[in-house]
């Protein structure tokens, strides 16, 4: 193992108990950090205040501790970092967006638009047009969203497993509008990773398409992008992403969860220290793990 002194992290969203897929990703994040001589940190991603709860966060931290997982500083919480995001926003080119979700969906059906990307409806409005839309929202008790004014269509990142990745960059949301403005995930995660010294991000490969956007934000903010490691998801028998509706899949419902995580990683050890001794990231399978509810270890 190396002696590099960067940091990896696990950053759960506290909206419920950790399930098998969450625990597997947490273990992989810990293994990668320790294998490369990095510190390991926990950040509670409760930037979405309406879906997060301190009770869920406490239960998740208890579960990670019960696995034998350790971290090198007290867990941090995004709800304490809003001043950071406000400061970052001041350093980013942005504009107000008055579109509803329905507006964006309808605009995205127009010819020559890229599915899933914001079509730029509010990007070049005149100040008179902006004031009209601002007042219309105010009558509804809402405020505009804030979007990045991106000056490139794509951005390049390198992932440990996927290699070179060129991904789309659009005018992404930085702060959501509505009755209660919320900071957007892409901005929050980039700002927090930089502030916390995170230089290794291990997470599910469903987030691979977010990496170019986040790396571009890091570039605009003048901070280094982390090394990305996107790992396969855990799927149910139907080939869909594992969810709580699939049955007894949470850690608290599975007393044998760590041995099963080890099995899914091709490791024979049944403790985290033992798994670390065996772990070789270059031998880790890149195929999704199919979770069998009643499978015996």
From Swiss-Prot:
Transmembrane segments: none annotated. The keyword Ligase applies. Binds 1 zinc ion per subunit. Zn(2+) binds at residues 97, 99, 118, 122. Pfam families: tRNA-synt_1c. Keywords: Aminoacyl-tRNA synthetase, ATP-binding, Ligase, Metal-binding, Nucleotide-binding, Zinc. GO terms for molecular function: ATP binding; glutamate-tRNA ligase activity; zinc ion binding. Its cofactor is Zn(2+). The keyword Metal-binding applies. ATP binds at residue 244. A motif ('HIGH' region) lies at residues 12-22. Catalyzes the tRNA-independent activation of glutamate in presence of ATP and the subsequent transfer of glutamate onto a tRNA(Asp). Glutamate is transferred on the 2-amino-5-(4,5-dihydroxy-2-cyclopenten-1-yl) moiety of the queuosine in the wobble position of the QUC anticodon. HAMAP family: Glu_Q_tRNA_synth. Belongs to the class-I aminoacyl-tRNA synthetase family. GluQ subfamily. This is Glutamyl-Q tRNA(Asp) synthetase. It comes from Corynebacterium diphtheriae (strain ATCC 700971 / NCTC 13129 / Biotype gravis).
